[in-house]
Amino acid sequence: MKRIVPLYYVKNVLRKCYSGLLCPQLCLLCGKVSEAGLPLCSHCIQTEFEPYIGSDDLEHLCRAEPRCKHCGKILISEHEYCTCCRRTDGESAEKPRPACDRIFTLFPYIGLGQKLLPVWKNNNIRTFSTVFAPLIHSLCTQHPGLASLPLVPVPPRPKKLREKGWDQIEDLAKDLAVYPELTIYRCLKRQDGIPQKKLSKADRAVNLQGKITFSAKAVPEKLMLLDDVMTTGATLEACAHTLKAAGCKEVFGLCLFFD
């Protein structure tokens, strides 16, 4: 058993006691008391998030929508790829393949992400990681081979980390480390620069060039990047380029939200 597990359960017990006895935590979606002391209640997690993942349950599987085979966005046509990922007739056959071989995304940013991500990142409600970690674990265990891939947290900007004192992806990685099937592999570092969210799509593609570095002694053949939201995919691409330059053969991406 991982050493972090006992501390994880102690933290959960203390959070439930604090919420139940002193300061009840209200669900940010429905406004009812969250029995686990988390920012979302179990009912909203089950109804708003789990249907996007699917499960072994037939009813949930029928509600899971088809996804793009590359970026994981929900499809609105019968094509296997979304309009951004499929090659058009006019495109050159020499168009380079993405460094990130496939991306798994869980939830739409429009609606759920718009409401919850700013609260998580800007209001210091760090228990969101405890909400999302079981959902990511569920996705990984449903797809053969995913659970065996070491998860590489996308590194934050050092300036952001100094200002906030914490990083939501690192919190998420710590909660995922509780599961014995999952491995966290921290092997990337990032130099300071302009935040991606302030840039256009074209500028995002070049903003991180040379700013993501490999910091480990060894690199596995397959890795999976972990991030909170995918907009243009530029951050994942920059990280994937670095991993492949270090010798990784296949790089996947896993993001909570897609925009």
Regions found by a protein language model. Give the residues of each.
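Glycine-rich phosphate/pyrophosphate-handling loop used in enzymes and phosphotransfer proteins
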Residues: 1-227, 231-259
